UniProtKB/Swiss-Prot annotation:
InterPro entries: DCAF8, WD40/YVTN_repeat-like_dom_sf, WD40_repeat_dom_sf, WD40_rpt
GO cellular component: Cul4-RING E3 ubiquitin ligase complex; cytoplasm; nucleus
Family statement drawn from the similarity comment of this UniProt entry: Belongs to the WD repeat DCAF8 family.
Comp. bias (Basic residues): 116-126
Name of the protein: DDB1- and CUL4-associated factor 8
Organism listed in the record: Xenopus laevis
Ranges for the WD repeats: 194-233, 237-278, 284-324, 332-372, 388-427, 435-475, 479-519
Family matches, as PANTHER family: DDB1- AND CUL4-ASSOCIATED FACTOR 8 (PTHR15574:SF21), WD REPEAT DOMAIN-CONTAINING FAMILY (PTHR15574)
Gene transcribed to yield this protein: dcaf8
Top-rank lineage group of the source organism: Eukaryota
Region listing for Disordered, in residue ranges: 1-150, 561-601
SUPFAM superfamilies with a match to the protein in the record: WD40 repeat-like
Length: 601
C-alpha cells in the first residue's frame, strides 16, 4: 500500500470528519515511515511492474482497503463519539423516565385530589340536602302543628245570643269581637278609594265612626267608612310621604297629629263643618319620623320618634310645644327609631324600637342619660343578641292592659314579651309564617283583650295568629301591589281596616258563610321562608336590597300616571305644570327617593 494513497485517503477522511489527528496517531505514522522506507520503495517497484489490469485491480483493492481503513477509523472515531453521546442519551433517558415518573405521580396525585374533592363536594351536597330536608321536614312539622285542631272556643254565638235575648249578658259585643269564629269569617266588605299614592297610615277615632288615612300623595282623608264617602280631605302640609295621622283622644275629633318622611310633626285643626282650618309644624326631626305615640286620655300631649334617634314630647298647650325627651343610644352610637308606643296602663312608660335588635323601655320620670343611656330595661330574643344578621324592629305595640309588648323584626318573626319581666328577659311567644322585609311593616293586636296578633306581609297577605296558641287562624289576600303595611282594628266592633301599596283602604268584616280553609297557606309560608333564607345569605343593611325595587316601582307608577295625564291634556293644558299646584311635584322630583313608600332614610 502506497503512502500517497494513505495521504489521499487521509484527506478524504479529514473531509469526512473520520481522520484521527491525535498526537498518538501522528507519532506512530512517522515511526513507520522511518523504519520501513525500503519496503515502501520495493513495494513501489513491484507495483510499477504490474500490468494494467493488475494495476486497476490493485488500485481497486487499494481503494477498498483504504475505504475499509477509513471506515474503521471512522467507526473508531464514531464509536468514541457515540460513547460520549451515549452517556448523555442514557442520562437524558433517565431524566425522561424520571420526569415521566414524576408526571405519573402528579397525575395520580391530581386524580386522588379530584376524587377527594368530589367526595367533599358530595358530602357537602349531602349535608346541604340533609339540612334542607331537615328544614323542610321541620317546616312541614310546624305546618302540621298549625293544622292541628284548636281547643274549643270559649265564646259560642248561639248561647251568647240566647243569653243576650234573656238580658243576662251585657258584654255581648265585647266578647264577640274577640271570638275566633268571627276572625275566621273575615271577608272583604269594600274598599275606600280617594288617594293617588300608597296608603301608609290608618286610625279610627274614639267612637269608631271615622277613619283617617294618610298617603304618599301628601293628603289626609277622613272617611265615613260605612257609607264609603270622604268626610274631609286636606293637604297635610308635609313635603314628603305622610307616615302617620292620628286623632288625639278626648279632643272631639278636632285635632289630628301627623308625622312624615320630611321629619316634621304637624297638627291639623279640624272644624265641625268638615273642613281643615290650618296645619302647623310643632316639631322637626333631623330624619324621617315614622310613628307617634298617644297618651290614652290626653288631648294635648303625645310623643314622636325619628330616625335621628330623638324622642320628642309635645304639649300643645305650650308656646314651644316640643321638647327633647331622650336620644336613643347603644353605648355611644345613636339608634335611629322607627316606632314608639305608650304603655296604656302606665303612661309615664313608653317603648321604642328601630335600627337594632333591642326593645327599649323608658320611664319619663327616671330618664338619666348618664346611667344606662336612660333606659329602664331592654328586651331582645336571645338568639338575635349575638346574631351576625342585623335585626331591626319595624313596629311595636303594647297590649290592651300594658302587660305584654309585641315587636315585629325586619326579615324575622314577631315576638311577644312580658313587659313586667326583668331587663334582658326572653320572649314568651313567637309568631311565624309572614315576611317583613320590603317596608316598615306594622303589627297590632286584635280583639278587646288582645286575643289575636295581626300583621301584613310582603307576599300581599294578612296573617292573624291566635295569641295563646301561636296558630294561624286567618289568612287573607290583602293587597294587589304585593305588600300590606297597616292594620287598624276598630275600637268597638269586629272590623279591621288595612292598607298597603294599593291606593285604597280595605274594610274587613266577619261576613263569610264558612270559616276560612287556609287554602294555599303552606305554599305561601314555604315561599316566604325560602326568600328570607336566600336574602340572609347576602344581607347587608336594612332594606338596602329593596330600595332599588321600590325606586323602580315608584318610577314606573309615576311614568304611567304622567303618560295618562299627557294623553288626556292638550298642548295648552300642558303649560299648567308650572302652576302652584304642581310646585309640590317639582319638590318631589328633587327629593326623588323620598317619595318611596315606607323606606327609611
Amino acid at each position: 500500500m502506497s503512502f500517497s494513497g494513505e495521504m489521499s485517503n487521509g484527506k478524504t477522511d479529514v473531509t469526512n470528519g473520520g481522520f484521527s489527528s491525535s498526537p498518538e496517531d501522528m507519532s506512530g505514522a512517522e515511526e513507520g515511515k522511518e523504519n520501513s522506507s525500503g519496503i515502501e520503495v520495493e513495494a513501489s517497484d513491484v507495483s510499477l511492474s504490474l500490468t494494467a489490469d493488475e494495476t486497476g485491480t490493485t488500485q481497486a483493492e487499494s481503494r477498498d482497503s483504504c475505504s475499509e481503513t477509513s471506515g474503521e477509523d471512522k467507526d473508531s472515531d464514531s464509536m468514541d463519539d457515540t460513547g460520549h453521546y451515549s452517556i448523555n442519551d442514557e442520562n437524558r433517558g433517565n431524566d425522561q423516565s424520571h420526569s415521566e415518573d414524576e408526571e405519573e405521580e402528579e397525575e395520580e396525585d391530581e386524580e386522588e385530589e379530584a376524587v377527594r374533592h368530589r367526595k367533599r363536594a358530595q358530602r357537602k351536597r349531602a349535608n346541604r340536602d340533609q339540612e334542607s330536608s331537615d328544614e323542610e321536614r321541620a317546616l312541614d312539622d310546624w305546618l302540621i302543628s298549625e293544622k292541628t285542631p284548636l281547643p274549643p272556643p270559649q265564646w259560642r254565638a248561639l248561647s251568647a245570643l240566647r243569653q243576650r235575648q234573656m238580658g243576662s249578658s251585657t258584654r255581648f259585643i265585647y266578647e264577640a269581637c274577640g271570638a275566633r269564629g268571627f276572625v275566621q269569617r273575615f271577608h272583604l266588605l269594600h274598599g275606600l278609594d280617594g288617594h293617588s299614592g300608597c296608603v301608609n297610615t290608618l286610625h279610627f277615632n274614639q267612637r269608631g265612626t271615622c277613619l283617617a288615612s294618610g298617603s304618599d300623595d301628601l293628603k289626609v282623608v277622613v272617611w265615613d267608612w260605612v257609607r264609603r264617602k270622604p268626610v274631609l280631605e286636606f293637604e297635610s302640609g308635609h313635603k314628603s310621604n305622610v307616615f302617620q295621622a292620628k286623632f288625639l283622644p278626648n279632643s272631639g275629633d278636632s285635632t289630628l297629629a301627623m308625622c312624615a318622611r320630611d321629619g316634621q310633626v304637624r297638627v291639623a285643626e279640624l272644624s265641625a263643618t268638615h273642613c281643615c282650618k290650618n296645619t302647623k309644624r310643632v316639631a322637626q326631626h333631623k330624619g324621617a319620623s315614622h310613628k307617634l305615640a298617644l297618651e290614652p286620655d290626653s288631648p294635648c300631649t303625645f310623643l314622636s320618634a325619628g330616625e335621628d334617634a330623638v324622642v320628642f314630647t309635645i304639649d300643645l298647650r305650650q308656646d314651644r310645644p316640643a321638647s327633647r325627651l331622650v336620644v336613643t343610644k347603644e353605648k355611644e352610637s345613636k339608634v335611629g327609631l322607627y316606632t314608639i308606643y305608650v304603655n296604656p296602663a302606665n303612661t309615664y312608660q313608653f317603648a321604642v324600637g328601630g335600627r337594632d335588635q333591642f326593645v327599649r323601655i323608658y320611664d319619663q320620670r327616671k330618664i338619666n342619660e348618664n346611667v344606662n343611656n336612660g333606659v329602664l330595661k331592654k328586651f331582645c330574643p336571645h338568639h338575635l343578641v349575638t346574631s351576625e344578621a342585623k335585626a331591626n324592629i319595624t313596629c311595636l305595640v303594647y297590649s290592651h292592659d300594658g302587660s305584654e309588648l309585641l315587636a315585629s323584626y325586619n326579615d324575622e318573626d314577631i315576638y311577644l314579651f312580658n313587659s313586667s319581666h326583668s331587663d334582658g328577659a326572653e320572649y314568651i311567644k313567637r309568631y311565624k309564617g309572614h315576611r317583613n322585609n320590603a317596608t316598615v311593616k306594622g303589627v297590632n293586636f286584635y280583639g278587646p283583650r288582645s286575643e289575636f296578633v295581626v300583621s301584613g306581609s310582603d307576599c300581599g297577605h294578612i296573617f292573624l295568629w291566635e295569641k295563646s296558641s301561636c296558630q294561624i287562624v286567618q289568612f287573607m289576600d290583602g293587597d294587589k301591589g304585593g305588600v300590606v303595611n297597616c292594620l287598624e282594628p276598630h275600637p268597638h266592633l269586629p272590623v279591621l281596616a288595612t292598607s298597603g301599596l294599593d291606593y285604597d283602604v280595605k274594610i274587613w268584616l266577619p261576613t263569610a258563610k264558612e270559616p276560612t280553609e287556609l287554602d294555599g297557606l303552606k305554599e305561601v309560608i314555604k315561599k316566604n321562608k325560602r326568600e328570607r333564607d336566600e336574602d340572609s345569605l347576602h344581607h347587608t343593611d336594612l332594606f338596602d336590597n329593596h330600595m332599588l325595587w321600590f325606586l323602580m316601582h315608584h318610577l314606573r307608577q309615576r311614568g304611567q300616571r304622567r303618560r295618562r295625564r299627557d294623553a288626556g291634556l292638550g298642548a295648552g293644558d300642558a303649560e299648567s305644570d308650572d302652576s302652584p299646584s304642581s310646585s309640590d311635584s317639582s319638590d318631589d322630583d328633587e327629593d326623588g327617593p323620598d317619595r318611596v313608600q315606607c323606606i327609611p332614610s
